[in-house]
Amino acid sequence: MSGGNAYALPYADLVMDAPMTDSGLLLTARAVPFYQIALHGVVDLSVTALNEEQNVTEAFLKAVETGSCLKWRWIARNEDELVETDYNSIISARYENWIDIAIDQYSRAESLLNRVAEQTVVSHELLSEDGTLVRVVWSDGTEVFVNYSDRDATAGGVSVPAQSFAVKEGA
């Protein structure tokens, strides 16, 4: 299934393009990945194609934070041929431009994502006032610290590099 359609969830074993952002309503003070917290460990989730996001690093970190499978959408043709066509939305999809980034991100996240694939979220905390430092605790005790800031941080005795993540393995 693609997207977050609640009516189809009982019949799905995979939700592709799970929403990564909040509704954007002005009533909320902080965005919390409720959809992923509620469904992770019940159904497999993937993010939208990372190379189609405005900020690829932030989207990658959101996938790590939520334990969602990484996804890219690629083509082999020259994307200039797609401008002003029905396929205009995939003009940033030439695989040659993304393969090295995808390999790097996948190799950094693979171990963690495999470890938490069937776990549920026990706790999700914003550790900084601006919400750029997040701690997620999984049901096996694994702690993931995600740093969206451009400065290194320390949390729970763990150093978390800028715009990266760190893992503290559970029992």
Model segments located where?
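Active-site-proximal substrate-binding groove within the catalytic cores of carbohydrate-active enzymes
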Residues: 1-171
